[in-house]
Amino acid sequence: MFYKNDQIAGFDDSIWQAMEQEDKRQQDHVELIASENYTSARVMQAQGSQLTNKYAEGYPGKRYYGGCEHVDVIEQLAIDRAKELFGADYANVQPHSGSQANAAVFMALLKPGETVLGMSLAHGGHLTHGSKVSFSGKIYNAVQYGLNEVTGEIDYDEVARLAKEHQPKMIIAGFSAYSRVVDWQRFRDIADSIGAWLFVDMAHVAGLVAAGLYPNPVPIADVVTTTTHKTLRGPRGGLILAKQNDELAKKLNSAVFPAGQGGPLMHVIAAKAICFKEALGEGYVEYQQQVIDNAREMAKTFQTRGYNVVSGGTDNHLFLLDLIDKGITGKDADAALGRANITVNKNSVPNDPQSPFVTSGLRIGTPAITSRGFGLEEAAALTGWICDVLDDISNEQVIDDVRSKVLDLCEKNPVYR
């Protein structure tokens, strides 16, 4: 028999110690990984609930197991809230991750070996947009587009040329490291010109879209996927959205279950429903606007200090720092900043001479620092400290000095109050 007051501490001290150390790391480090954020206590509470015990293969009202009457209510609420939040007619809240949501779209719309056109990983795309190390580049014939060398923005003329030349069955719009506004309609027009599906992955900007601060692709694309964490600030998971199309909805549902997954994670779906309600509530638009403002302040400060920001700035929550002209690798920059309690991730940049394991850039994002209360003043100061480290990357005294400042800033702005 289990009791609600059972504790990990005292039973599994090894796990508990690692958990406590991670709590301390999150409190004492500034988090600038663009795909990370801090969920609300409500979201975490749902994920630690007894819902984790329930198997519920199928969909609300059409389950393969009994005893699903209450989890049906939860999943339907998550579906309805997702549709309201993004103006969709269809929503599937079951994907365990963004990559699994993307895999379901591929499975629903394509046959193995068919051609897809997606953004190059080195130019800001995602593994699942056609990278050769991903299912998307192994099972399907992937063609890649990139950024204009002069503007650092998506080269729509190249997209149109590649689409005409290769006749893909599906075009993927979306990114994991692109800082400008994507012209969804331009992609729609290109897809229509060759009779291709338009699939948008808005995982990184879903929170901004929900707040009305970034163009919504749902009315334009055939299908849209997103994660539920990142800017959306919910649990780690995936979501598929679409306009009214009964045949497409059936294909997508079947591609998620039974083709791609078995039982849904009902505790995570409950957390998604809570996250969607939070996004529909007061203060959410202001939060997302601050995310953008902080990113712009950081990008501007980097440029003032002589650093190259890919695409020349940002319109969302992230940007890429190109370190090629500084003679610094992303790997070394990541490690040095880590010693200063600043967490970033190394990232490939356009025309990167380094391997993906080394890189010549950093990806920087502001959702997490905004969640813990950082404003423009803190964002500018933090950027200056990062520049101090990168300007003298081997100077451990500089790193120690910056770490002290970071610890002080973190103490004043706790992750959870």
Swiss-Prot record:
Catalytic activity annotation: (6R)-5,10-methylene-5,6,7,8-tetrahydrofolate + glycine + H2O = (6S)-5,6,7,8-tetrahydrofolate + L-serine
Necessary cofactors: pyridoxal 5'-phosphate
Organism annotation: Colwellia psychrerythraea (strain 34H / ATCC BAA-681) (Vibrio psychroerythus)
EC number: 2.1.2.1
Annotated site residue numbers, Plays an important role in substrate specificity: H229
Residues binding (6S)-5,6,7,8-tetrahydrofolate: L121, G125, H126, L127, S355, P356, F357
Subcellular location(s) per record: Cytoplasm
Main localisation: cytoplasm
Superkingdom of source: Bacteria
Gene name linked to the record: glyA4
Matches recorded under CDD domains: SHMT
Keywords noted in UniProt: Amino-acid biosynthesis, Cytoplasm, One-carbon metabolism, Pyridoxal phosphate, Transferase
GO biological process: glycine biosynthetic process from serine; tetrahydrofolate interconversion
GO CC field: cytosol
Protein family membership: Belongs to the SHMT family.
Alphabetized GO MF terms: glycine hydroxymethyltransferase activity; pyridoxal phosphate binding
Enzyme class: transferase
Short name of any one Pfam family annotated for the protein: SHMT
Protein name: Serine hydroxymethyltransferase 4
Residues the record lists as N6-(pyridoxal phosphate)lysine modifications: K230
Physiological role: Catalyzes the reversible interconversion of serine and glycine with tetrahydrofolate (THF) serving as the one-carbon carrier. This reaction serves as the major source of one-carbon groups required for the biosynthesis of purines, thymidylate, methionine, and other important biomolecules. Also exhibits THF-independent aldolase activity toward beta-hydroxyamino acids, producing glycine and aldehydes, via a retro-aldol mechanism.
Pathway in which the depicted protein is active: One-carbon metabolism; tetrahydrofolate interconversion; Amino-acid biosynthesis; glycine biosynthesis; glycine from L-serine: step 1/1
Gene3D superfamilies per the UniProt record, alphabetical: Aspartate Aminotransferase, domain 1, Type I PLP-dependent aspartate aminotransferase-like (Major domain)
Subunit text: Homodimer.
